[in-house]
């Protein structure tokens, strides 16, 4: 039977071990980063999100873009002068949803990184380009459902337009409901090509309407945003 003094020493030793473990957990990323260089630390940070999960809040949208599975591959890192900022270029294979909309995406992603307190971390989202495309798609869906032509005009590129018979058919409906059931996205360097599976419900003076289908959409990058081109439909 151990004496109270022996139990006290064991308890003190356990406290020391736990304290060391906490210090190592905090300091390990910094130590590894110094030993391996920023490129390895940035790549490790991106790959870590595959286990931690990916959830991105979009501006003006209460529901986050949430991934079920995602994988970064072919990652390269570009360090900026000064050594405090960098950019990771990668391919991102993503499957998830935004609200009730299923999303599958494959293609190019560019992730800005900054060094904070000796640790490299994404400056914002770990999938900023995917988030920008999904935000544009969701804003379009909302504007179509609301019949908001001013909002629709803000979503198109400089040389694009919002006119067309398909758009007129949507806006002609009363009690309109426009659902994007799925978006299948292919991300290129400066462009995104999307197949949308949609459902449109509403009423005309002569009859109710309940239609479903698929359409192809194209978005072009302008800075950090994506705009529809040549048309919204």
Model regions and ranges:
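Short, low-complexity patches enriched in S/T/P/G
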Residues: 2-12
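Short beta-strand edge/turn micro-motifs at domain boundaries
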Residues: 2-4, 87, 99-131, 191-193, ...
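Hydrophobic membrane-insertion alpha-helices, especially the h-region
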Residues: 11-29
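Aromatic-capped interface at the extracytoplasmic side
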Residues: 28-37
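Short solvent-exposed beta->alpha transition segments
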Residues: 39-96, 149-197, 204-207
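Short solvent-exposed loop/turn micro-motifs enriched in small/polar/acidic residues
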Residues: 70, 104-106, 135, 178, ...
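A short local loop/turn or secondary-structure capping micro-motif enriched for an aromatic residue
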Residues: 96-98, 128-134, 201-204
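Surface-exposed beta-loop interaction hotspot
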Residues: 121-149
């Amino acid at each position: 039977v151990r004496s109270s003094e022996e139990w006290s020493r064991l308890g003190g030793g356990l406290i020391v071990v736990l304290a060391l473990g906490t210090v190592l957990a905090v300091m390990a990323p910094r130590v590894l980063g110094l030993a391996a260089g920023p490129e390895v630390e940035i790549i490790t940070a991106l790959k870590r999100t595959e286990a931690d999960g990916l959830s991105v809040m979009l501006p003006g949208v209460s529901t986050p873009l949430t991934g079920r599975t995602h994988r970064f591959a072919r990652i390269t890192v570009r360090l900026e002068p000064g050594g405090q900022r960098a950019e990771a270029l990668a391919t991102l294979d993503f499957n998830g949803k935004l609200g009730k909309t299923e999303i599958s995406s494959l293609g190019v992603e560019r992730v800005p990184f900054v060094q904070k307190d000796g640790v490299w971390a994404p400056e914002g989202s770990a999938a900023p380009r995917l988030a920008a495309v999904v935000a544009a798609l969701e804003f379009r869906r909302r504007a179509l459902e609301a019949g908001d032509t001013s909002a629709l005009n803000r979503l198109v590129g400089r040389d694009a337009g919002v006119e067309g018979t398909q758009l007129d058919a949507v806006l002609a409906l009363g009690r309109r409901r426009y659902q994007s059931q799925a978006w299948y996205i292919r991300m290129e360097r400066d462009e995104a090509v999307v197949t949308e599976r949609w459902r449109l419900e509403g009423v005309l003076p002569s009859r109710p309407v309940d239609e479903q289908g698929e359409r192809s959409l194209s978005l072009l990058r302008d800075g950090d945003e994506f705009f529809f081109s040549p048309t919204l439909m």
